């Protein structure tokens, strides 16, 4: 299942916000959507309301329109009119075949199974503020659930061969499609020096889950809080994952408790959980994140990933697509922090200035300054600021700031407002 569009309905926080998850080039929904923005703009609220819709769409009153697809068939729920008695008319449609499936008075049993969103086994993972390392009992329970998943694979293997005596499989072939193979592959790809190798028995004949670090077997009690976090949040996904691996996943702040290097890899970790045997992602993953490292990785995959920035504009929440490609020839943390979080930095300013020099063959600062001044978007009243360095005079604010950064001892200061003004001009030049 994949979400395509949402139109909210006078929500307390989100108002009448509209979200579109479609790739305009293909007309298909993005496989991955990442929400970003300051605290309080509704990232987690969007995920929570989506979960409510997936559970009981007829009992949700936050939306005017939701469009989704299941196995390439597009369905929609739409609230059309308010009746005199205060009730709402609901239109449930098969958009692909232009058929009205149900109108008004919806109850769960009324839905055609193939179009019912709460038959799709979506998975929702909230962020955790508590440290699993401080609650060993909780993590012990997670490990027991991991053992159960391993046993489930074994039972399914035996059941398959009993049910299909004429086409029995070797364990190695069956394991390729199993949940624990999925986990092992994603886990081992994530960690450089740590591996999961399966379930075994200790000297007391008790079942144990096997991990190695730097080639040495380690007990689960010695795992770090970040390592435990990866396992803890992965287990519910494995438990609810269906055979087709096409569960819709809603994940709030997957980077919690993780080092920045791991934050950069967690995006791929969740994608890896839902790859088929040919390496193709089968589901849609919708995340909310504050991590520059995760977002840098997300922005590097514009073919299947959409980044949406939610922002408060005079009390109204608006959605802004972070479009691709970026202004630079490659993605940098400085650009991510500006485009996604609205944080201007001298580093990003100079990256843009250097990009202009390289792209337009203006290697000398003076030549670049003249090029900027001659650009149609340049306005001397806004973008002009005369400065000198040695015997050379520069006329643009961008060159002034560039020289102030590179020659910090020249006594030239600049404000954040000037920094943003110069950044916006250079973005227009590079657009």
Annotate the PLM regions.
Residues 4, 9, 20-22, 69-71, ...:
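A structural detector for beta-sheet-dominated domains
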């Amino acid at each position: 299942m994949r979400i395509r569009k949402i139109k909210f309905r006078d929500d307390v926080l989100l108002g009448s916000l509209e979200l579109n998850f479609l790739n305009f080039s293909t007309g298909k929904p993005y496989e991955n959507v990442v929400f970003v923005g300051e605290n309080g703009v509704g990232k987690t609220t969007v995920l929570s309301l989506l979960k409510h819709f997936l559970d009981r769409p007829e009992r949700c009153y936050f939306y005017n329109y939701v469009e989704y697809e299941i196995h390439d068939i597009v369905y929609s729920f739409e609230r059309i009119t308010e009746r005199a008695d205060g009730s709402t008319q609901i239109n449930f449609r098969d958009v692909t075949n232009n058929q009205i499936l149900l109108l008004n008075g919806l109850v769960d049993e009324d839905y055609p199974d193939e179009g019912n969103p709460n038959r799709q086994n979506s998975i929702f993972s909230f962020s955790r503020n508590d440290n699993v390392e401080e609650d060993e009992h909780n993590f012990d329970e997670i490990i027991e659930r991991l053992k159960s998943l391993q046993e489930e694979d074994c039972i399914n293997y035996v059941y398959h061969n009993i049910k299909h005596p004429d086409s029995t499989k070797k364990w190695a072939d069956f394991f390729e499609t199993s949940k624990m193979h999925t986990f092992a592959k994603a886990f081992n790809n994530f960690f450089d020096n740590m591996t999961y190798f399966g379930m075994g028995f200790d000297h007391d004949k008790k079942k144990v889950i096997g991990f190695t670090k730097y080639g040495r077997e380690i007990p689960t009690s010695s795992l770090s809080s970040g390592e435990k976090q990866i396992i803890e949040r992965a287990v519910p996904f494995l438990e609810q994952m269906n055979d087709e691996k096409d569960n819709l996943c809603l994940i709030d702040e997957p980077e919690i408790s993780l080092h920045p290097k791991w934050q950069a890899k967690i995006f791929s970790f969740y994608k890896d959980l839902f790859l088929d045997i040919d390496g193709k992602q089968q589901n849609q993953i919708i995340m909310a994140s504050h991590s520059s490292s995760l977002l840098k990785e997300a922005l590097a995959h514009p073919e299947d990933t959409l980044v949406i920035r939610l922002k408060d504009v005079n009390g109204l929440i608006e959605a802004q697509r972070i479009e691709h490609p970026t202004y630079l020839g490659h993605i940098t943390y400085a650009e991510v922090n500006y485009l996604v979080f609205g944080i201007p930095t001298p580093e990003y300013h100079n990256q843009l200035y250097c990009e202009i020099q390289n792209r337009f063959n203006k290697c000398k600062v003076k030549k670049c300054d003249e090029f900027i001044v001659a650009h149609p978007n340049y306005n001397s009243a806004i973008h002009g600021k005369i400065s000198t360095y040695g015997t050379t005079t520069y006329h643009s604010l961008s060159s002034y700031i560039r020289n102030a950064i590179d020659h910090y001892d020249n006594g030239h200061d600049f404000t954040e407002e000037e920094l943003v003004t110069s950044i916006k001009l250079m973005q227009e030049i590079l657009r």
